[in-house]
């Protein structure tokens, strides 16, 4: 479940029109969410409150070998921040948990053509962005957290300098470990690419990240084309000035929708040339209430590989319509009446409706124009061909929009998350749901291997309380035991 302060941070980005989908740090966020989700390791309770429209606080308790806790405080001067925040009772489950991330396409519109090539939704978004840029006011966010009984501190400051740039400062201080780390981020987002300069006092680490979006131009024949694909390429470079340790990686991401079903899918390919590590992922929404992800890792130097799988199963409310109870994931064919209804709600007509019927317009042609019969037949054939092609584009767009609207309008009550790795022989199970105003997460991680305990450190053995009998080892039995188990409760007002 997404922590409360992360929800506030996401609301701050939304209120200040800062997109996180262009960040190289989150380029593989979908696969990480479906495969590497966090399992609670103890009984955890989080109570949060919005004391004023601009201040938020949170209190955490956990019982892991002893009672631990933390106190968090956040302040922001963003005026519309409260419009994006909801308490634990009202927030939709799909917004309170990390799940499949749907991206917005990056369209390249010509300046001279204005909005003639843009879709209705994109036009509205561009108008909002232009209005925001013209009336931009600098916004800030201040966050602090103190842990007890260790008295560790962490802090974060975010400054929106202008509509395209942002400055972030993060700090961690630990008296017990004599650790004090300060990290600075300067980000510049030009919509087509996002550049990020990073400096950390730990090893005097310097870093540079960049993510470039290959913008696509809509068709000249389509004044309302729903562009459903996005291609991005990013890279990062690191250098520790003290140890002179370099680091780098690059990732390619492709996001699109299936034109037949409207279901989104994401493909990524990552490469680390220094360590010879190659990773590829495939993530897809297989239905309105199910998601699947597969990841393959391979190392060029050690010839080691790993295959991981992850999936999600969402449960809706039981009082749905009878027609949708048995066919939650079945997309019905779009009828002509539905297309006409959707067209009336848009400012721009559908494409095939803009094509004139030459058979009806032949009487309106001036008598001075004498069109031969064979040319008239050719024009009619071309009109029919273009009309059918444009109708197909409209139906594909309507299918994609229908699938997205079906997910957004659904009310989910719980979700099951499963993840497994063939090399590590682990199985992670997580259940997340809502109950009487509480957001609940409960899960466990199971291990199916004999030599797993030897690979763990002493701290992990003590924390997880793992013990394997000598009889199982001598007999060669493969033990099945949980390395983690916990439950987490969140409540916010």
Curated annotation (Swiss-Prot):
Membrane topology type: Multi-pass membrane protein
Keywords per UniProt: Membrane, Mitochondrion, Mitochondrion outer membrane, Transmembrane, Transmembrane beta strand
Domain of life: Eukaryota
Keyword Cytoplasm in annotation: no
UniProt subcellular location: Mitochondrion outer membrane
Annotated GO biological process: establishment of mitochondrion localization; mitochondrial genome maintenance; mitochondrial outer membrane translocase complex assembly; mitochondrion-endoplasmic reticulum membrane tethering; phospholipid transport; protein insertion into mitochondrial outer membrane
GO CC annotations on file: ERMES complex; mitochondrial intermembrane space; mitochondrial outer membrane; SAM complex
Keyword Membrane: yes
Pfam families: MDM10 (PF12519)
Record text on subunit structure and interactions: Component of the ER-mitochondria encounter structure (ERMES) or MDM complex, composed of MMM1, MDM10, MDM12 and MDM34. Associates with the mitochondrial outer membrane sorting assembly machinery SAM(core) complex, which consists of SAM35, SAM37 and SAM50, to form a SAM(holo) complex.
Family, as annotated: Belongs to the MDM10 family.
Domain notes: Lacks alpha-helical transmembrane segments, suggesting that it resides in the membrane via beta-sheet conformations similar to those predicted for other outer membrane proteins and porin.
Described purpose of this protein according to its UniProt entry: Component of the ERMES/MDM complex, which serves as a molecular tether to connect the endoplasmic reticulum and mitochondria. Components of this complex are involved in the control of mitochondrial shape and protein biogenesis and may function in phospholipid exchange. MDM10 is involved in the late assembly steps of the general translocase of the mitochondrial outer membrane (TOM complex). Functions in the TOM40-specific route of the assembly of outer membrane beta-barrel proteins, including the association of TOM40 with the receptor TOM22 and small TOM proteins.
Name recorded for this polypeptide: Mitochondrial distribution and morphology protein 10
Organism, as annotated: Saccharomyces cerevisiae (strain AWRI1631)
Lineage: Eukaryota, Fungi, Dikarya, Ascomycota, Saccharomycotina
């Amino acid at each position: 479940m997404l922590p409360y302060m992360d929800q506030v941070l996401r609301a701050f980005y939304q209120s200040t029109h800062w997109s996180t989908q262009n960040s190289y740090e989150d380029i593989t966020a979908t696969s990480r969410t479906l495969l590497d989700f966090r399992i609670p390791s103890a009984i955890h309770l989080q109570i949060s409150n919005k004391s004023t429209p601009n201040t938020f606080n949170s209190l955490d308790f956990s019982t892991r070998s002893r009672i631990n806790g933390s106190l968090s405080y956040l302040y922001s001067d963003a005026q519309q921040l409260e419009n994006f925040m909801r308490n634990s009772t009202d927030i939709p489950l799909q917004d309170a948990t990390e799940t499949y991330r749907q991206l917005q396409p990056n369209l390249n519109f010509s300046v001279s053509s204005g909005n003639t090539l843009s879709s209705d939704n994109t036009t509205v978004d561009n108008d909002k962005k232009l209005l925001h840029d013209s009336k931009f006011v600098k916004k800030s966010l201040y966050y602090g957290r103190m842990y007890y009984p260790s008295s560790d501190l962490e802090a974060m400051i975010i400054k929106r300098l202008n509509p395209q740039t942002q400055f972030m400062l993060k700090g961690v201080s630990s008296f017990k470990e004599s650790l004090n780390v300060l990290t600075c981020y300067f980000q510049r987002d030009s919509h087509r690419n996002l550049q990020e300069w990073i400096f950390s006092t730990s090893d005097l680490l310097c870093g540079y990240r960049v993510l470039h979006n290959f913008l696509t131009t809509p068709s000249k024949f389509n004044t309302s084309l729903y562009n459903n694909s996005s291609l991005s390429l990013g890279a990062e470079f690191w250098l520790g000035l003290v140890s002179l340790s370099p680091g780098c990686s690059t990732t390619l991401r492709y996001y699109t929708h299936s034109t037949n079903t409207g279901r989104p899918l994401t493909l990524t390919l990552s490469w680390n040339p220094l360590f010879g590590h190659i990773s590829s992922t495939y993530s897809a929404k297989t239905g309105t209430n199910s998601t699947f992800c597969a990841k393959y890792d391979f190392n060029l130097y050690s010839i080691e590989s790993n295959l991981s799988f992850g999936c999600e199963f969402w449960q809706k409310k039981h009082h749905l319509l009878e027609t949708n109870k048995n066919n939650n994931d079945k997309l019905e064919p779009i009828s002509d009446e539905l297309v006409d209804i959707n067209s009336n709600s848009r400012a721009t007509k559908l494409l095939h409706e803009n094509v004139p019927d030459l058979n009806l317009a032949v009487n309106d042609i001036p008598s001075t124009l004498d069109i031969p019969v064979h040319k008239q037949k050719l024009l009619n054939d071309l009109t029919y061909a273009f009309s059918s092609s444009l109708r197909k584009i409209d139906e594909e767009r309507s299918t994609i929009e229908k699938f997205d609207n079906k997910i957004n309008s659904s009310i989910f009550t719980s979700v099951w998350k499963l993840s497994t790795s063939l090399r590590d022989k682990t199985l992670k199970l997580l259940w997340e749901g809502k109950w009487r105003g509480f957001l609940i997460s409960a899960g466990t991680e199971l291990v199916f291997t004999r030599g797993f305990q030897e690979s763990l450190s002493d701290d992990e053995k003590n924390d997880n309380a793992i013990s394997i009998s000598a009889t199982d080892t001598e007999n060669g039995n493969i033990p099945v035991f949980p390395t983690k188990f916990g439950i987490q409760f969140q409540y916010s007002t």
